[in-house]
């Protein structure tokens, strides 16, 4: 998956490949009316999410969303974007979790397995198709994150360009300004890569489930279970992180760093870190907190590695166990 992110696309991941073209062609072509209705529904959804985000950020219109423009933008966007990210991850899982069951239902699976590289290409194509089908959601997530990255760059110009100096004052460990700039750039890189690798990981997990559990009923039950587990992890880490930031959770040292790193990697894919005010607070509250951006980037790359391994495992399992 890391090679794919670098632009080295294999043949089966390109839309002109016949297997991927067949996979993408399974979706029913929508009429003009259906497309317009879908666009209208999406527009209404965006408006509702924006209104909900503003109401949450302002405490039901009782206070401003933030003390600055960038803080306000982040506060309004946080909850809607978190919800969209969660739904995108679940969608990636469900799009691949029934891969083998679908092919068995179409009576194609035995033919694919008897053809050289047939099952392997089918599994790879289904995984690649996930990105094509979720491209609009992923594109929206990345676009909004780019807006937040732009907010960070804008904030760095505050105090005559000395804002980063002020944030790094008194943190542990003490680092030169150039190191702070480098680590902040790694955060922004990790925050843009994490959604892509998370979708790839969820899609690969669904693919692995599909070759192990082929009965549709059990597959659906596992998907529901995975959704609840994901929701519990996200909600638990979000609650713990909120309590920690408010000073209501008495942890320090390595425990606080692991909480912040786990939250950034598993709960919101580094979304909270894209508010430079919040991220600067973590530098002070958490030992080595300035390294959280590096941790997020490494976690995203590790997710990509795990996705590759799960896809390879799914291919081997399908070849050995039919």
Residue ranges, per PLM feature:
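Short helix-to-coil transition segments within interhelical loops
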Residues: 113-120
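Hydrophobic alpha-helical transmembrane segments of membrane proteins
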Residues: 1-108, 121-322
């Amino acid at each position: 998956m890391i090679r794919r992110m670098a632009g080295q696309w294999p043949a089966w991941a390109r839309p002109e490949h016949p297997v991927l073209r067949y996979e993408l062609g399974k979706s029913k072509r929508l009429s003009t009316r259906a497309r317009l209705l879908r666009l209208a529904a999406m527009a209404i959804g965006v408006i509702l999410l924006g209104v909900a985000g503003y109401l949450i950020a302002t405490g039901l219109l009782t206070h401003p969303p933030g003390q600055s423009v960038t803080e306000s933008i982040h506060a309004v966007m946080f909850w809607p974007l978190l919800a969209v990210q969660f739904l995108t991850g679940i969608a990636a899982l469900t799009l691949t979790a029934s891969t083998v069951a679908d092919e068995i239902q179409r009576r194609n699976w035995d033919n694919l397995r008897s053809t050289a590289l047939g099952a392997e290409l089918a599994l790879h194509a289904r995984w690649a198709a996930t990105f094509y089908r979720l491209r609009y959601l992923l594109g929206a997530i990345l676009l909004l994150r780019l807006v937040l990255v732009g907010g960070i760059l804008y904030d760095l110009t505050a105090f005559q360009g000395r804002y980063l100096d002020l944030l790094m004052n008194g943190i542990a460990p003490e680092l030169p300004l150039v190191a702070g700039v480098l680590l902040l750039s790694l955060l922004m890189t990790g925050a843009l890569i994490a959604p892509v690798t998370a979708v790839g990981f969820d899609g690969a997990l669904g693919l692995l489930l599909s070759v192990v559990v082929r009965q549709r009923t059990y597959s659906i039950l596992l998907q529901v279970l995975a959704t609840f587990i994901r929701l519990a992890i996200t909600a638990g880490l979000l609650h713990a992180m909120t309590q920690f930031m408010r000073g209501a959770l008495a942890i320090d040292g390595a425990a606080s760093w692991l909480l912040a790193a786990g939250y950034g990697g598993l709960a919101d894919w580094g979304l909270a870190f894209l508010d430079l005010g919040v991220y600067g607070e973590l530098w002070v509250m958490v030992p080595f907190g300035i390294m959280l951006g590096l941790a997020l980037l490494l976690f995203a790359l590790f997710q990509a590695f795990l996705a590759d391994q799960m896809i390879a495992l799914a291919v081997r399992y399908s070849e050995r166990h039919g």
